[in-house]
């Protein structure tokens, strides 16, 4: 069927409110003639109907169940501005190359959402509707957030520009490392890793997502040893350093206590995990803003709902929500590392974090223009399976405003942690110098690294150990678009 040509079937007048069951199309949730307002929130869903279910009806059901509808007509609709508050599915397209899947464009009136609340937004657009029986699967692919709604959020407490000013580091990616092994180290040994990595040339070290307060190392002990390491490394190098102290805990009271202690010790940054939830993330963002702290977000748990192509929530949507919620850093993929990341899709994530305005770019998976209304920018973090030998590729794909985190690529160095950090710093400086000189650092990357390694034994060792190690697997989440040939002039 040609889903794009099906006309409105909305029942008008008294018949609309007769008791009984009525199709979602007839209840007014399918409005192909509707033109979205500048103030509408627009969602793009990938809808996979059950066999025999009309895709228009399935898409209208998504609109209804994520806004005002229930399974039967209710007379109390007449006590509301029902036609205004109904979400309106106004377009349904087949997904290119995916039989039985459809893109449904749904517009929501801004008054349906509480200002400045990610929890309220998500309770509607990814609430009960994802369990709706007539659907095999449902995925939220993208959203257009109107300026009127964006302005109700505070956004990142620090932002890229101010973070660079505080660190006094410009013109290059920042370097970091996640402490490994992620679990099992004592506080003293943990602090030793932090010191050696920072002294060797890194800007940051980082707790991993699941290091909180365990029997082998309580949080207070870790914070004390880490900040001793940071202070010693700063004194030794003359550079501002930091360590992402994970304050994730069982309750908000515990998290505030840990964050306050980190501040008292002089930390410039604290860390939280995505799994703490949207309300907790916004609460910690408010705390970070009041206390002039950088807020780092580890996206722990995201792949449980972002990785599958047909069901869940795209990470581009999570990126938008987190920019609104107010985090300064977010892990956003590496392209060449060990974790999921199609190159074009990942560039879309980075654009969402870093740009003031996102134009529609279907090849990057971005379906809508997005104006960020001067909201601070988020620093993306690339972490997971990267090493010095990939430096030219990382800069090519990810650009300059990014934190490159070499965990195993620092701590696994055969000459030790400090040497691993030095290898990464020298590789980065060599590549940035080549870029600034106007050289083709991408094609000349291996040559540039080899020349730098000739006078840097740690880098030479790193290149010998990891060579051209990469994780070359097909992505499960590539953009859905069909390139169109440009006619000859």
Swiss-Prot record:
Its EC number is 4.1.1.39. The active site is at 180 (proton acceptor), 298 (proton acceptor). The gene is cbbL2. Binds 1 Mg(2+) ion per subunit. This is Ribulose bisphosphate carboxylase large chain 2. PROSITE patterns: RUBISCO_LARGE (PS00157). One of its GO terms (molecular function) is monooxygenase activity. Substrate binds at residues 128, 178, 182, 299, 331, 383. GO terms for biological process: reductive pentose-phosphate cycle.
